[in-house]
Amino acid sequence: MEDVLATAEGVVLVKLVKVAQKLGLKGENGTWKEFLDFYDKQLGSSSLSDPSKRRKDDLVAFLTTLKKKEDLQLLAKSLKLDNDVFEKFKKKSLDETAEQRLVRMTLTHDEYPLDYLFPSNAEDWVRTGLGKKKMEPTKIEMIAIDCEMVLCEDGSEAVVRVAAVDRDLKVILDEFVKPNQPVVDYRTFITGLTAQDLEKATISVVDIQEKLLMFISEDTILVGQSLNHDLKVLKVDHARVIDTSLVFKYNYDGTRRPLRLKRPSLNYLCKCILGYEVQKEGVPHNCVHDAEAAMKLVLAILDNGAETSVPLSKEMLEAEKSKLYLHRIPCNVPYEELNGVVSRDIPHEVKPSKKQDRHYYSAIVVFKSPEEANQAFENIAGDFGKDSRGLSQKQIFLEPSSSEPRLYVLVRKMVEDDLVGEVIAEENNASSKKRKRENHSKGTRDRRRCKPLSRRKQRSNVKRRR
């Protein structure tokens, strides 16, 4: 959000502050007027509350104090509503195609506005469909994209490999990209790439943008799993997208209250929908395979009528209970240093997320059983609370440093303890209902076979025997 605000025009910032005023949004220093009382006192200036009469820096300073996810989503939605191209593809029409329905499902998802809020006004960004001539009909209608990223010295992520496949699963792009910053972490355990792999890379992000634009027009549909991360590192803002992490969702039927699990992973979707794992345990990612998998998931819906809800089984929940989620990890803290943060006594494995932002990243801590994960969480001495999803969470301070402020990470449960019981109870209930239906159906058939003949049919049978 900060990058977007820094490049936004003044009139846009004024509108956002007015939206925040109207909704009564509060940042770290309160509402807009409360913020001004604090802010102007520090600067020693007079307080003008009309946003249109304030400097751009003042507006940005207030908006960056808004930290609640739901508040940021509201602001992101306000920004997106100004995008005519976005509005065009968001609306439902009578002649809507199956492909466009998936685009609309993505664009109307609650998480979309914030995920796809890009600083596309910046000079090095490309916005498709704006002032560009539409390409000839040789264009590919759907393209799946996936990228591999590394961590740079300044804390930013840089794309180092890009893959794109078309609707026929033909690879139309597979390029190594030269990072424009010194790399501090190649994330070989995820990307499979090393410094040697990139020694001969000469292509820049600008070159990749030009190559992509050879295939993309305003009407092209870009496909991907958590595609916003890939578009962000490519610095491409494209309105017509299908994000499989937003299209597919867990089936929560039968539970007493909504479950707040993370979005289904690409691997889990492939297992449920396609019947295979795209990412094997201990094997680095391959962006070509990941792009193909995302396209196959979309084709499974379009060509085979696959459902967009995936089952929530007790086995899956048990596996989730064997994990803890580490987040808000500062990018300057290597993941290897996290091994003893959650527990020094209980064996576990730390698996960093493939996707990271400029300042923080997240990781999954995997234990051998739900009991060990729960014990590790109970042993943490940090402050207990709930995250925005209502899940149990604690704060862990890292080892103090003499030269830096004390850093901390947050650790939370993946699911609450009673949810597995709910799902098991619902599965047992469903099995019981199924048995009752089968028994009822069997009993009905038996009664029909044993039903006495009427007197007329009995006399008829006697006559035949005579």
From Swiss-Prot:
Q: Which Gene3D superfamilies match?
A: Ribonuclease H-like superfamily/Ribonuclease H
Q: Which residues form the Exonuclease domain?
A: 142-298
InterPro entries tied to this protein: Exonuclease_RNaseT/DNA_pol3, REX1-like_exo, REXO1/3/4-like, RNaseH-like_sf, RNaseH_sf
Name the source's superkingdom: Eukaryota
Could you tell me which residues belong to the region Disordered? 426-466
Per the record, the major location class is nucleus
EC number(s) given by UniProt: 3.1.-.-
Keyword entries, A-Z: Exonuclease, Hydrolase, Nuclease, Nucleus
Any idea which GO molecular function terms this record carries? exonuclease activity; nucleic acid binding
Q: Which residue windows does the record flag with biased composition (Basic residues)?
A: 445-466
Q: Which Pfam families match?
A: RNase_T (PF00929)
**Record-stated family:** Belongs to the REXO1/REXO3 family.
Its recorded name reads Small RNA degrading nuclease 2
- Origin species, per record, is Arabidopsis thaliana (Mouse-ear cress)
